[in-house]
């Protein structure tokens, strides 16, 4: 164990101040020399005080100057030493704080070690107790296994006894159920015969009512269907006749317009051809005039040349004027044709729309007629189905009557599978009272 912290710190502080710090200090070279000189000067003063007094008497002036210099040196040395001493004090304080921190850390580690030892002791005690508990638990487990084996043997014997009792009870219950089932079958057979007679009468009444209602509805549907078909035929014929008339009128109008336009275009073509022939004749006459002039003026070449140029210029001007006039006429005609074409295109679009509307009406009338034909076919099929159902019901009624008269339902010699059917007859009695009725 360590000593107390106060005693250890004081002893360590003394040792550091006495030995360690002064040896380990790294002072600069100038300071060490000054300290040595200071110590030697002090020793010389102590040893030779008389020599100093004699020297002071002989040379006072020199001493005064030397003393002033020495005093200045001593002051500088003292200041340096005071700074050095302060630095040493700071180092001592830092070392003391570090050492105190080390002591605190060591004390903390010692306390943790003591706590770890205490925990080790407690854990060892717990291990000992757990070993004892393990031994006790193993002994109890062995005892419980023995008890389980004993209980298993007892349980097997009890189960065997229960199986034997269950088999005996099962045989007794089977015998009782057989007796009860035979008695109930006899009762249910009698009840079934009574209910069959009741349902027979009900079925006959329902069958008669259905036949009457079916005949009335059939007549009504046929009458309404024939009336609808006649009305649709009349409307269809009238609409067809009107559409055909309007279509023929429009067709005639369009044909007349086309013929008129063709005639006008042919007239325009003939006029243009006549104009072209007149222009060709003019050109031929002018050429002949030019030839005659050339023959007459062949003696003067300059005059001939000038006249030829004038005539050529005149011909060119006339040709250009005629071309311009023709182009103006063509433009006027083209504008008229464009206007006529636009009007005709508008009329054609309008007539096409009307034709499309008429076609749509025709398609609608055709669809309505097809619907009516399909409805008529469906009604005929439903009537045929109802007639088949009525026939089937009549056949079933006849079979039931035949069975009742022959006594098939009252036969005592029947298998157990067949006897299960009358057992469910009161619950399923609705099957007789709800025959297949068509929605019509």
Swiss-Prot record:
PTM-bearing positions, type Phosphoserine: 373, 394, 415, 425, 429, 431, 433-434, 438
Superkingdom field: Eukaryota
Residue stretches in coiled coil: 106-401
Ranges for region Disordered: 407-440
Presence of the UniProt keyword Transmembrane in the record: no
Keywords linked to the UniProt accession: Cell cycle, Cell membrane, Coiled coil, Golgi apparatus, Membrane, Mitochondrion, Nucleus, Phosphoprotein
Localization terms from the record: Mitochondrion; Golgi apparatus; Cell membrane; Nucleus
Disulfide bonds: none
Family: Belongs to the MTUS1 family.
Quaternary context: Homodimer. Interacts with AGTR2. Interacts with PTPN6.
Protein purpose: Cooperates with AGTR2 to inhibit ERK2 activation and cell proliferation. May be required for AGTR2 cell surface expression. Together with PTPN6, induces UBE2V2 expression upon angiotensin-II stimulation.
PANTHER family assigned: MICROTUBULE-ASSOCIATED TUMOR SUPPRESSOR 1, TOUCAN, ISOFORM A
Protein name: Microtubule-associated tumor suppressor 1 homolog
Gene transcribed to yield this protein: Mtus1
């Amino acid at each position: 164990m360590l000593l107390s912290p106060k005693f250890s710190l004081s002893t360590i502080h003394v040792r550091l101040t006495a030995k360690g710090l002064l040896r380990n200090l790294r002072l600069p070279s100038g300071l060490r020399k000054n300290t040595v000189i200071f110590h030697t000067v002090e020793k010389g003063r102590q040893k030779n005080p008389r020599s100093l007094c004699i020297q002071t008497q002989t040379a006072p002036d020199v001493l005064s100057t030397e003393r002033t210099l020495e005093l200045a040196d001593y002051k500088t040395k003292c200041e340096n030493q005071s700074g050095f001493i302060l630095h040493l004090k700071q180092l001592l304080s830092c070392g003391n704080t570090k050492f105190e921190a080390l002591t605190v850390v060591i004390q903390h580690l010692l306390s943790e070690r003591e706590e770890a030892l205490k925990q080790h002791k407690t854990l060892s005690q717990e291990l000992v107790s757990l070993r004892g508990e393990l031994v006790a638990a193993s002994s109890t487990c062995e005892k419980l296994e023995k008890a389980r084996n004993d209980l298993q043997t007892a349980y097997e014997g009890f189960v065997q006894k229960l199986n034997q009792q269950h088999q005996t009870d099962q045989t007794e219950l089977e015998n009782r159920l057989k007796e009860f089932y035979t008695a109930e079958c006899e009762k249910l057979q009698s009840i079934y015969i009574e209910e069959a007679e009741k349902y027979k009468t009900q079925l006959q009444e329902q069958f008669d009512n259905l036949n009457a209602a079916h005949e009335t509805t059939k007549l009504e549907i046929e009458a309404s269907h024939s009336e609808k078909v006649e009305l649709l035929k009349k409307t269809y014929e009238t609409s067809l006749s009107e559409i055909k008339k309007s279509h023929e009128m429009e067709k005639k109008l369009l044909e007349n317009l086309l013929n008129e336009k063709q005639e006008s275009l042919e007239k325009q073509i003939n006029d243009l051809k006549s104009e072209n022939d007149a222009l060709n004749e003019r050109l031929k006459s002018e050429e002949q005039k030019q030839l005659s002039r050339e023959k007459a003026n062949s003696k003067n070449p300059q005059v001939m040349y000038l006249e030829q140029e004038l005539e050529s210029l005149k011909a060119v001007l006339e040709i250009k004027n005629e071309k311009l006039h023709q182009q103006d006429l063509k433009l006027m005609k083209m504008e008229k044709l464009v206007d006529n074409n636009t009007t005709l295109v508008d009329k054609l679009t309008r007539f096409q729309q009307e034709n499309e509307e008429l076609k749509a009406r025709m398609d609608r009338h055709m669809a309505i007629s097809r619907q009516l034909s399909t409805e008529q076919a469906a009604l005929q099929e439903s009537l045929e189905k109802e007639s088949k159902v009525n026939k089937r019901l009549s056949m079933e009624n006849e079979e039931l009557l035949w069975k009742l008269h022959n006594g098939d339902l009252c036969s005592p010699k029947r298998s157990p599978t067949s006897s299960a059917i009358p057992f469910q007859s009161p619950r399923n009695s609705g099957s007789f009272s709800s025959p297949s009725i068509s929605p019509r």
